[in-house]
């Protein structure tokens, strides 16, 4: 069962998503991956941030109310 993140709510904030990524990587004992992931998340627009997040955590989370133009590859 995956968690649903409403991207139009406070959990859809880019800073919240980066903090969530940090938290989950810590819980998975993979904190060393965060700096590279954060750099990749910040290297483009909001849709890029969402794609990077989904690539890493797609088995844990689903997005609700994704912005127009966002497509999860």
Task: Give a label for each model feature.
Residues 1-73:
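Long, contiguous binding/interaction regions
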């Amino acid at each position: 069962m995956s968690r649903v993140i409403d991207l139009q709510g406070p959990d859809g904030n880019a800073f919240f998503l980066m903090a969530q990524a940090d938290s989950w990587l810590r819980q998975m004992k993979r904190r060393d991956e965060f700096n590279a992931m954060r750099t990749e998340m910040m290297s483009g627009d909001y849709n890029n941030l969402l794609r990077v997040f989904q690539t890493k955590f797609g088995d844990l989370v689903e997005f609700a109310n994704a912005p127009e133009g966002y497509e999860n590859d």
